[in-house]
Amino acid sequence: MKVTEVKVFPVNEDRLKAYVSITLDNCFVVRDLKVIQGTSGLFVAMPSKKRKDGQFRDIAHPLNQETRAMIEDLIFEAYEKELKSMGETLVSLKRQKAPGSDYGNDDY
């Protein structure tokens, strides 16, 4: 699987820094990934839906660490490029692990 396109849509909110869409193999789009400012750095949140019990569950997510790292690296690279094109820069792209990023746990 190859990520063939990353589109970053910056937003000006407190913790939410950008929405992101990725295209896989030029034939499948995943929308509503988010770049979020956490307590110890930025992280990528997968698309999610709020359940009846108030918890959020990923709609789509990588099944292993290698795929997650590859997607996150491409998103952070595109995010930093987008900021530079807007005249902004990150002093340091401090990253943290996404909360609840347990691979393969699809219990509903």
UniProtKB/Swiss-Prot annotation:
The keyword Metal-binding does not apply. It comes from the Bacteria. One of its GO terms (biological process) is sporulation resulting in formation of a cellular spore. Pfam families: SpoVG. Gene3D superfamilies: Stage V sporulation protein G. InterPro entries: SpoVG (IPR007170), SpoVG_sf (IPR036751). The keyword Cell cycle applies. Keywords: Cell cycle, Cell division, Septation. Coiled coil: none annotated. Belongs to the SpoVG family. Could be involved in septation. This is Putative septation protein SpoVG.
